[in-house]
Design a protein with these regions (language model features):
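Conserved beta-strand positions
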Residues: 1, 28, 59-62, 92, ...
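Acidic-and-aromatic substrate-binding clefts and catalytic sites of carbohydrate-active enzymes
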Residues: 1-10, 33-37, 66-70, 97-98, ...
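N-terminal binding-site loop/beta-alpha segment at the start of enzyme catalytic domains
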Residues: 1-24, 55, 83
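Short amphipathic alpha-helices and their capping/turn segments at secondary-structure boundaries
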Residues: 11-18, 45-50, 132-141
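Structural motif corresponding to the early beta-alpha repeats
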Residues: 19, 23-39, 63
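Short, acidic/polar
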Residues: 36-53, 73-76, 100-105
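Active-site groove signature of glycoside hydrolases
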Residues: 49-70
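Beta/alpha (TIM)-barrel catalytic core signal, keyed to glycine-rich beta->alpha loops juxtaposed to Asp/Glu
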Residues: 69-170
Length: 170
């Protein structure tokens, strides 16, 4: 997604996967910058596809809930993008359980694509997803791909536990 490294990672990835495209599941996100308006979602997906040098991604994520844009607008655009075969499965990142259910009610009402995959932060330290997100996903048969499984490096030893805080580091 553009928000990570200004899109450079997508360009690199696009070059690396050229020969192996059918063997991988390609994912991108939109909506972190500029919100979830139909115009912005379309623009961000098309820019990602251009950087990736691809015609489609397998999974397209909305980066987060947008209080300023009606779900109907966002999902109408997602419907058109899916019909154009620019993505095949819809994911949402950083949505609360109630937001996923509301999005799927709108999708059902208007025959828009429903949420197929959730992306909550989830690791051994940050386990809040176990309270509502994961049970809801199981109940609704929605897939889960967590982000930050290594806690931003906390669980890799990146941070030295022997260093204690003092007035100069807090």
């Amino acid at each position: 997604a553009f928000v990570y490294t200004g899109g450079k990672s997508e360009k690199i990835l696009g070059n690396l996967i050229r020969e192996e495209r059918e063997k991988i599941i390609l994912i991108t996100k939109a909506g972190s910058v500029g919100g979830s308006s139909g115009e912005n979602i379309r623009s961000q997906l098309e820019q990602s596809l251009k950087r990736l040098n691809q015609d489609y991604v397998d999974i397209f994520f909305l980066h987060h809930w947008d209080n300023d844009v009606p779900l109907e607008e966002t999902f109408e655009t997602l419907q058109k993008l899916k019909e154009e075969k620019k993505f095949f499965q819809l994911g949402v990142s950083n949505f609360a359980a109630w937001q996923v259910l509301k999005a799927n009610l709108i999708a059902q009402k208007y025959n828009f694509p429903s949420v197929d995959i959730l992306q909550p932060m989830y690791n051994i330290v940050k386990r809040q997803a176990e309270v509502e997100i994961l049970p809801m996903a199981k109940s609704e048969n929605i897939g889960v791909i967590s982000y930050s499984p290594l806690g931003g490096g906390l669980l890799t030893g990146k941070y030295d536990a022997s260093i204690t805080s003092n007035k100069n580091t807090s």
